[in-house]
């Protein structure tokens, strides 16, 4: 089939690679002059299936209210004039019940665990250079209350068979020796050895090069105008004077998919959740994490690359505003300076922001749309890279009419009625 993929982030490029591998003729359209230049560009650098869980969880509405009053809050809301923001938040809070959380968590873990398997197969097949490490994630607890609360997370991990290690402060230093330099700040941790790290930008560029070898055509600086319908079916994409005919179209436009598809009568429950990161040159290899650590208090991840440190996190509901908020810089700088004060040169930090495409229930949208011939692969939230390989393989199988390795139940737009 002739297939057009819209969007050159990690989800779009991964979709294109799997579709080309299945034998399809694939064209990828991207408005920027290269791949992974927006949300996939400078994320936290984690592939974390062990942390595949919806933000919509019991107790979150109360926590969110408290966070709004904190100086270094992990979550903030900047009200906009768009009524969709409020509707999306109400849908999210409606998913904060124990029953909804359990259902959504199960769907996300199913896809994330499958994606980890797909990622391993992909990594074994292709010699991709993306500064990847397979050394796990260490979640750090600064208080006994956080450590005690992790027992609920451990129960969920055991339920889904996710390997873990519950560690005291000494155990955390054994996994991440640099933490010994700030002894007394951490009371314990939860390690997920199956998680991975790396530079998502480098990964996406490397995979795009492999996709080109399979015949994928990349069209950059391409401003997509609309999807053309014939007898109710998606048959082409128009971009200026260009027309790209297609047997199938994959929308992997992240947060921008919602507005783009609205003229077709498709109501996507995907809203941008703004995240921030700092990238620092490493100054002392013994004073930084070996892999990635997640500060539970501030919801900030610190990830080691070859010669750099990536500090990422935060969640800001402010629409499509891409302005860099200096308060977020202060929080990220505070966390990395507090835990790894001698590891990087903060004076040379690169400050970045991106818009994560989030659904109210946390589960992405992977599968058919209400318009025949148009397929969705968006809404992955903070787990875009974590779920990219599994989502790409699943979508390729669905489009190809092949049997799928996992069920797509609850992963499509159909769950929203």
Swiss-Prot record:
Pfam families: DAO. The keyword Zinc does not apply. Its cofactor is FAD. It is an enzyme of class 1 (oxidoreductase). It comes from the Bacteria. GO terms for biological process: D-alanine catabolic process. Keywords: FAD, Flavoprotein, Oxidoreductase. One of its GO terms (cellular component) is plasma membrane. InterPro entries: DadA, FAD-dep_OxRdtase, FAD/NAD-bd_sf. It catalyses: a D-alpha-amino acid + A + H2O = a 2-oxocarboxylate + AH2 + NH4(+). FAD binds at residues 3-17. Its EC number is 1.4.99.-. GO terms for molecular function: D-amino-acid dehydrogenase activity. PANTHER family: D-AMINO ACID DEHYDROGENASE (PTHR13847:SF280), SARCOSINE DEHYDROGENASE-RELATED (PTHR13847). Belongs to the DadA oxidoreductase family. This is D-amino acid dehydrogenase. It comes from Aeromonas salmonicida (strain A449).
């Amino acid at each position: 089939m002739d297939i057009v993929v819209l969007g050159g982030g990690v989800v779009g490029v991964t979709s294109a690679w799997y579709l080309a591998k299945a034998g399809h003729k694939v064209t990828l359209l991207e408005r920027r002059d290269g791949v992974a230049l927006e949300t996939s560009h400078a994320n936290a650098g984690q592939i974390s299936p062990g942390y595949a869980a919806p933000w919509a969880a019991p107790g979150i509405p109360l926590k969110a209210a408290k966070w709004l009053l904190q100086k270094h809050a992990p979550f903030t809301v900047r009200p906009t004039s768009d009524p969709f923001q409020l509707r999306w938040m109400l849908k999210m809070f409606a998913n904060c019940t124990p029953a909804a959380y359990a259902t959504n968590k199960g769907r996300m873990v199913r896809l994330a665990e499958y994606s980890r398997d797909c990622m391993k197969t992909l990594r074994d097949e292709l010699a991709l250079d993306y500064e990847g490490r397979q050394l796990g994630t260490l979640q750090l607890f600064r208080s006994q209350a956080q450590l005690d609360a992790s027992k609920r997370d451990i129960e969920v991990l055991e339920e889904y068979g996710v390997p873990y290690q519950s560690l005291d402060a000494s155990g955390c230093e054994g996994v991440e020796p640099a933490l010994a330099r700030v002894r007394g700040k951490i009371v314990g941790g939860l390690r997920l050895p199956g998680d991975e790290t790396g530079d998502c930008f480098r990964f996406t560029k490397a995979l795009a090069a492999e996709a080109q070898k399979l015949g994928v055509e990349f069209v950059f600086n391409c401003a997509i105008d609309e999807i053309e319908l014939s007898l109710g079916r998606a048959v082409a994409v128009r971009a200026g004077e260009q027309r790209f005919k297609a047997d199938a179209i994959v929308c992997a436009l992240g947060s921008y998919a919602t507005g783009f598809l609205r003229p077709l009568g498709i109501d996507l429950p995907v809203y941008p959740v703004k995240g921030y990161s700092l990238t620092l040159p490493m100054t002392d290899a013994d004073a930084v994490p070996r892999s990635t650590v997640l500060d539970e208090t501030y919801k900030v991840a610190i990830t080691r690359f070859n010669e750099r440190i990536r500090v990422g996190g935060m969640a800001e509901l402010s629409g499509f505003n891409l302005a860099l908020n200096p308060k977020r810089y202060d929080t990220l700088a505070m966390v990395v300076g507090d835990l790894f004060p001698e590891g990087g040169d903060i004076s040379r930090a690169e400050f970045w922001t991106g818009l994560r495409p989030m659904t109210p229930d946390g589960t992405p949208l992977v599968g058919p749309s209400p318009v025949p011939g148009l397929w969705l692969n968006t809404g992955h939230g903070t787990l875009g890279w974590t779920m990219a390989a599994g989502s790409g393989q699943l979508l390729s199988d669905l489009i190809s009419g092949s049997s799928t390795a996992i069920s797509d139940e609850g992963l499509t737009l159909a769950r929203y009625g």
